[in-house]
Amino acid sequence: MPAIEVGRLCVKTRGREAGRKCVIVEIIDDNFVLITGPKDVSGVKRRRANINHIEVLPEKINIQPGASDEEVKKALEEAGLLDFMRERVRIELKPGLL
């Protein structure tokens, strides 16, 4: 099972959207992926993200690479994951980062 793949759910661990869940929409290169919340579901805008700034979750939805926000939202509804996506995750800071 590859960890970074299209349709995989993940949590942003850095930046202003830290703790919010998102979906990998497209793999750009070895270091970056295109993610989306969609914004009206979890608050994450469609944007490029470094793979070191996301934490992959075991859940996966079936979408095509480059899927629109509407297609992602529909796939989340079909999988029954809309409420799961709206929940935030608490990011624990390591003592060295304080």
UniProtKB/Swiss-Prot annotation:
A GO BP entry: ribosomal large subunit biogenesis
Alphabetized GO MF terms: RNA binding; structural constituent of ribosome
Keywords noted in UniProt: Ribonucleoprotein, Ribosomal protein
Keyword Ribosomal protein belongs to the record: yes
Recorded GO CC terms: cytosolic large ribosomal subunit
SUPFAM superfamilies assigned to the protein according to its UniProt record, in alphabetical order: Translation proteins SH3-like domain
PANTHER family the UniProt entry points to: 60S RIBOSOMAL PROTEIN L14 (PTHR11127), LARGE RIBOSOMAL SUBUNIT PROTEIN EL14 (PTHR11127:SF2)
NCBIfam families documented for this protein: PRK04333.1 (NF003320)
Family per record: Belongs to the eukaryotic ribosomal protein eL14 family.
Entry protein name: Large ribosomal subunit protein eL14
Organism field: Hyperthermus butylicus (strain DSM 5456 / JCM 9403 / PLM1-5)
Record lineage: Archaea, Thermoproteota, Thermoprotei, Desulfurococcales, Pyrodictiaceae
Gene of this entry: rpl14e
